[in-house]
C-alpha cells in the first residue's frame, strides 16, 4: 500500500512478499514508453523497495483490536507465526538444535513479509524520499538482523555465506522460477521485459562483484603490502565506497529524475488511457511505527535463537554449515518474496519479477554486504569482503550467466529451467564443498 510516487529502482525484498494483494502494485515506466506494452517498464529496478502505490490522504482510525486483525489476521502466511514461540520453548525444553533452527527459520518467514507491509503503510505518510529510505532500511532487515547477531557471536563466515546465498538465490532460483512459471502460462509467446534496465542492473551486479573480487585476489596471490591487514583495509575502504555509490544511486533515483517516470496500472485496452486509483492506508502512521518496532524486536529475538542453533543443526542433520547458510537460510527466509516474483511473472509483469530478483540482489550486494563490513569494523570484528576463492568465483560466474540470459530482453520457460538447474548445481557444489575457514563459523 505504498503511497508515494517513488521512481523505479526501488525494489525491496520483503515488499514483494505481499502475495495477497499484488494486484494493487503500481508500475512505473518512462513517459515515452509505447502504450502497447502491458508489462510495466521499470527503469533500473532494484535497490530500494518495490513501486509505491498511490495512497489517499485519509487516515484510518482503528482500535487496537482492528489494527491487530489487519496486520496479523489478514494474511494466510501468518499461520506460520506460532512456530517462533515454539522454537523458543524448545530451546529451554530440549537440546535438539535441528528442530530449534528449523522452527526459528519458519517463524521468521511471515515476520519478514509483515515488516514489508508495515513499511509500506508508514511510507504513505512520509513522502517519496523518506519512504524510499525507509524501504532501503527495512528492505532486507531480516538478513541484516541475522547478520548482526552472527557478527556478535563471531560467526563471520555465516554472515558472508548467508548474504552470498541471498544473492545467488535471487539471481538463479527466484528469477528462474519466475521465467519458468511465466513461460508455462504464456507458452505461445515470449514474455518481454525492459532490456535496457536489465543490462544496467547486470552492470551494477558486476560492480558489486568487483568489490568482492579484489580482496580475494589480493589474498590468494599473496601480494599484500602488509600480510593480513592490507586485505582488511581494502575491504573496509571498498565498503565505504560501495555505500557512497549506493547513496548516490538512491539520490539520483529519488531526487534527480523522479519526474521522468509516471505510475501505470495494467492496461486493459491498448486504446484506453491508464489511470491510478488512490488507495487508503489501512493503518495510521503511529500504528505503522509501533508495528515496525514490534516486528523488528520479534525478528531480533528469533534471530538470536536461529544463529545459536546453526552449528547444532549442522551436526544433527549432518549437513555442512556452508550449505545451511548459502542454501537453506535464503530459500526459507525469502519464501514470501519468491512467491510474489512468481505471481508477477504469471501475470505477465516480468519487470516487477526482475525487480524482486535482480533488484534484491543489488540491494544485498551494494548495501547489506558493505554495511555489515562497516558494522563489524565498529564492533571490532574482522569482517571483510574476502568471501574466499570458491564463493567469489561462484558469484562471478552466476552474474555472467544471468547477464547472458537477460541480454535479449525476452524470457521463456526454457530459460527459467536453465537458471533453476544452474542453482541446483550451485547447491550441490556447496553441499560437497569443505569450507577451509570452518573455524571462523
UniProtKB/Swiss-Prot annotation:
The cross-references to Pfam families, in alphabetical order and at most eight, read:
Na_Ca_ex
What biological function has been recorded for the protein in this entry?
A: Vacuolar cation/proton exchanger (CAX). Translocates Ca(2+) and other metal ions into vacuoles using the proton gradient formed by H(+)-ATPase and H(+)-pyrophosphatase.
Q: Which family does it belong to?
A: Belongs to the Ca(2+):cation antiporter (CaCA) (TC 2.A.19) family. Cation/proton exchanger (CAX) subfamily.
Topology of the protein relative to the lipid bilayer: Multi-pass membrane protein; Lipid-anchor
Question: Where would you find this protein in the cell?
Answer: Vacuole membrane
Per the UniProt record, the lineage of the source organism begins with:
Eukaryota, Viridiplantae, Streptophyta, Embryophyta, Tracheophyta
Q: Which UniProt keywords apply?
A: Antiport, Calcium, Calcium transport, Ion transport, Lipoprotein, Membrane, Myristate, Palmitate, Transmembrane, Transmembrane helix, Transport, Vacuole
Q: Where is the lipid attached (S-palmitoyl cysteine)?
A: 3-4
Say if the entry is tagged with keyword RNA-binding: no
Extracellular compartment ranges equal 91-97, 151-165, 219-231, 308-311, 376-384, 434-441
Region named Cation selection? 139-174, 333-368
Q: What is this protein called?
A: Vacuolar cation/proton exchanger 5
The residues that cross the membrane are 70-90, 98-118, 130-150, 166-186, 198-218, 232-252, 287-307, 312-332, 355-375, 385-405, 413-433
Q: Where is the lipid attached (N-myristoyl glycine)?
A: 2
Entry GO terms, CC: vacuolar membrane
Q: List the disulfide bonds.
A: none
For the keyword Membrane, the answer is yes
GO molecular function terms noted in the UniProt entry: calcium:proton antiporter activity
All ranges on the Cytoplasmic side of the membrane: 2-69, 119-129, 187-197, 253-286, 333-354, 406-412
Q: Write down the NCBIfam families for this protein, in alphabetical order.
A: caca2, cax
Amino acid at each position: 500500500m505504498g503511497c508515494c510516487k517513488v521512481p523505479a529502482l526501488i525494489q525491496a525484498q520483503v515488499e514483494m512478499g505481499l502475495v495477497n494483494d499484488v494486484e494493487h502494485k503500481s508500475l512505473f515506466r518512462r513517459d515515452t514508453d509505447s502504450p502497447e506494452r502491458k508489462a510495466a517498464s521499470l527503469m533500473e529496478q532494484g535497490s530500494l523497495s518495490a513501486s509505491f502505490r498511490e495512497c489517499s490522504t485519509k487516515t484510518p482510525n482503528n482500535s487496537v483490536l482492528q489494527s491487530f486483525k489487519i496486520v496479523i489476521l489478514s494474511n494466510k502466511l501468518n499461520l506460520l507465526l506460532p512456530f517462533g514461540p515454539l522454537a523458543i520453548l524448545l530451546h529451554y525444553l530440549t537440546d535438539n538444535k535441528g528442530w530449534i533452527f528449523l522452527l526459528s527459520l519458519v517463524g521468521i518467514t511471515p515476520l519478514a513479509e509483515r515488516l514489508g507491509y508495515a513499511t509500506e503503510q508508514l511510507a504513505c505518510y512520509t513522502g517519496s524520499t523518506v519512504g524510499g529510505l525507509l524501504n532501503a532500511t527495512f528492505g532486507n532487515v531480516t538478513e541484516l538482523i541475522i547478520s548482526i547477531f552472527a557478527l556478535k557471536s563471531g560467526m563471520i563466515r555465516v554472515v558472508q555465506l548467508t548474504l552470498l546465498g541471498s544473492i545467488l538465490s535471487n539471481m538463479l532460483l527466484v528469477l528462474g522460477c519466475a521465467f519458468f512459471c511465466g513461460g508455462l502460462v504464456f507458452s505461445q509467446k515470449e514474455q518481454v521485459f525492459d532490456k535496457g534496465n536489465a543490462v544496467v542492473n547486470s552492470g551494477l551486479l558486476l560492480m558489486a562483484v568487483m568489490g568482492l573480487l579484489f580482496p580475494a585476489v589480493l589474498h590468494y596471490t599473496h601480494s599484500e603490502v602488509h600480510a593480513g591487514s592490507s586485505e582488511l583495509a581494502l575491504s573496509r575502504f571498498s565498503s565505504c565506497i560501495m555505500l557512497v555509490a549506493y547513496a548516490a544511486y538512491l539520490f539520483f533515483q529519488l531526487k534527480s529524475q523522479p519526474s521522468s517516470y509516471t505510475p501505470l496500472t495494467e492496461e486493459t485496452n491498448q486504446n484506453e488511457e491508464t489511470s491510478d486509483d488512490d488507495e487508503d492506508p489501512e493503518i495510521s502512521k503511529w500504528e505503522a511505527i509501533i508495528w515496525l518496532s514490534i516486528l523488528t524486536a520479534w525478528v531480533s529475538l528469533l534471530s538470536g535463537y536461529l544463529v545459536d542453533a546453526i552449528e547444532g543443526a549442522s551436526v544433527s542433520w549432518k549437513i555442512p554449515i556452508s550449505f545451511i547458510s548459502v542454501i537453506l537460510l535464503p530459500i526459507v527466509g525469502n519464501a514470501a518474496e519468491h512467491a510474489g516474483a512468481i505471481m508477477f511473472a504469471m501475470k505477465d509483469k516480468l519487470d516487477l519479477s526482475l525487480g524482486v530478483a535482480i533488484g534484491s540482489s543489488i540491494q544485498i550486494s551494494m548495501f547489506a554486504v558493505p554495511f555489515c563490513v562497516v558494522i563489524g569494523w565498529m564492533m571490532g570484528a574482522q569482517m571483510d569482503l574476502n568471501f574466499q576463492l570458491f564463493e567469489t568465483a561462484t558469484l562471478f560466474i552466476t552474474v555472467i550467466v544471468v547477464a547472458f540470459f537477460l541480454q535479449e530482453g525476452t524470457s521463456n520457460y526454457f530459460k527459467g529451467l536453465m537458471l533453476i538447474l544452474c542453482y541446483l548445481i550451485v547447491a550441490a557444489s556447496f553441499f560437497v564443498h569443505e569450507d577451509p575457514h570452518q573455524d571462523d563459523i
